[in-house]
Swiss-Prot record:
Residues 161-197 are annotated as: Disordered. This is Small ribosomal subunit protein uS4y. Gene3D superfamilies: RNA-binding S4 domain. GO terms for biological process: translation. Binds to the translation initiation factors TIF3E1. InterPro entries: Ribosomal_uS4 (IPR022801), Ribosomal_uS4_CS (IPR018079), Ribosomal_uS4_euk/arc (IPR005710), Ribosomal_uS4_N (IPR001912), S4_RNA-bd (IPR002942), S4_RNA-bd_sf (IPR036986). The gene is RPS9C. Residues 109-183 form the S4 RNA-binding domain.
Length: 197
C-alpha cells in the first residue's frame, strides 16, 4: 500500500509572461503592484491567469447557440459568480460584459484593498500588515490572507477582530504596560526605573 504523506495540487495558479523584458508590460505591472500593495509580480500574474480562464470560458460559451442549454446553464452560473464577487453589476447580465473585465476589477475586490478603502488602514501596505497580523475579520471568520476575494454581501462585515487592540479588544502591549504602571502608583508603591524612563 502506498503511504501518502503529502497531497499536492499540481494545478497551475499563475502563468509567467512569454517575453520577460517588455518595457511597457514591466512598467504597467510595477504601477499595479505599487497601487494595490502586492508583494510580488506573481500575485499579479495569478489574477491575470484567473481572469484569462474566466474570459476563455465566456468566449467558449458565446460560440454556442443562444438557446443551447449548456450556454444558458453555465452562462448564468458564471454571471452569478461575477455578481456575487462584485465584479459585475446586477444590470450587467450578459456574457459580453465578462469579456470587458480587467485585472483592476479583480484587484479592487481583494481584502487588502477593501480594508484600505474603508479607512481601517493608513496605507495599502498597512492594510496588508493588519491582515497578516490577524487584526481583520470578515463576519465571524478571522482572515489573514490579503488576496481574499470579498463578496458583496460580506463587504459590510469587514471589521477588526474581537481580540485586536484596534477594535477595542485586548489592549496593546504599551497600553497594558502603562496600565500596570498606573496601578502601581495608585497602590502607593514607587514605580521601577523602567517606568520612569
Amino acid at each position: 500500500m502506498v503511504n501518502v504523506r503529502f497531497y499536492r495540487n499540481y494545478g497551475k495558479t499563475f502563468k509567467k509572461p512569454r517575453r520577460p523584458y517588455e518595457k511597457e508590460r514591466l512598467d504597467a505591472e510595477l504601477k499595479l503592484v505599487g497601487e494595490y500593495g502586492l508583494r510580488c509580480k506573481r500575485e499579479l500574474w495569478r489574477v491575470q491567469y484567473t481572469l484569462s480562464r474566466i474570459r476563455n470560458a465566456a468566449r467558449e460559451l458565446l460560440t454556442l447557440d443562444e438557446k443551447n442549454p449548456r450556454r444558458i446553464f453555465e452562462g448564468e452560473a458564471l454571471l452569478r459568480r461575477m455578481n456575487r464577487y462584485g465584479l459585475l453589476d446586477e444590470t450587467q447580465n450578459k456574457l459580453d460584459y465578462v469579456l470587458a473585465l480587467t485585472v483592476e476589477n479583480f484587484l479592487e475586490r481583494r481584502l487588502q484593498t477593501i480594508v484600505f478603502k474603508s479607512g481601517m488602514a493608513k496605507s495599502i501596505h498597512h492594510a496588508r500588515v493588519l491582515i497578516r497580523q490577524r487584526h481583520i475579520r470578515v463576519g465571524r471568520q478571522l482572515v489573514n490572507i490579503p488576496s481574499f476575494m470579498v463578496r458583496v454581501e460580506s463587504q459590510k462585515h469587514v471589521d477588526f477582530s474581537l481580540t485586536s487592540p484596534f477594535g477595542g479588544g485586548r489592549p496593546g502591549r504599551v497600553k497594558r504596560r502603562n496600565e500596570r504602571a498606573g496601578a502601581k502608583k495608585a497602590s502607593g508603591g514607587d514605580g521601577d526605573e523602567d517606568d520612569e524612563e
